[in-house]
Amino acid sequence: MADHTPRTAYTVESLLAVTVDVFNERGYDGTSMEDLSRAAGISKSSIYHHVRGKEELLRLAVGRALDGLFGILAEPAAVQGPAVERLEHVVRRTAEVLLTELPYVTLLLRVRGNTATEQWALERRRDFDHQVAELLRAAVADGALRADVEPRLATRLLFGMINSIVEWYRPGLKAADGVADAVVHLAFDGLRAR
């Protein structure tokens, strides 16, 4: 007798959600297609129906995080107004994207350049960091931020604070709404020219 239990229909999006969790738990290199098949509850051939392989899943996952970050730089508040206000907006929104796309950004922050996809992701991350550093330099040049902290160092410290969220934040915490504001207040109250 055939089993007529309805199976969950998998989409690329639902497969990606499972994949990101497995990559974050086991690491990209430590994950096999068999691991993904087991975690998703579908056959490997079903996975291959949606994607060409594990590296394509990685590219889709880190691409989602990167698209969220680069989308911030195109927002009106990131391109119009004084540099310090644009920078504050970018910092706040970066923290918000990290919180809303936590598993995807966590994966992005863990890539090391071992594959072509990881190298691509690292290059895009460097480009994003560079654009934020340029905003910070402009705010320093305007006299809105302290000039005694080298902009490259300040940018690294900002990203260090934001990126550390992946290590301690867990979805469902009541403090989620206040995290982005706390990052902005802590960063800019410490960086503002006095």
Per-range role (PLM):
Residues Y48-V51, E55:
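A short His-aromatic
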Residues V105-R110, E118-L122, R126, V140-L186:
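Hydrophobic/aromatic-rich alpha-helical bundle segments in the mid-to-C-terminal region
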Residues R59-A65:
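Alpha-helical DNA-contacting segments of helix-turn-helix folds
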Residues S45:
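Key DNA-contact positions within bacterial/archaeal DNA-binding proteins
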Residues L60, G71-T100, P151, T155-L158:
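Hydrophobic alpha-helical connector segments
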Residues E25-D29, V79-Q80, E101, D142:
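Short coil/turn segments at alpha/beta junctions that flank glycine-rich nucleotide-binding fingerprints
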Residues H89, A95-E134:
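Short secondary-structure transition hinges
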Residues M1-R26, G30-I42, E55-R59, G178:
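Basic, helix-initiating cap at the start of DNA-binding domains
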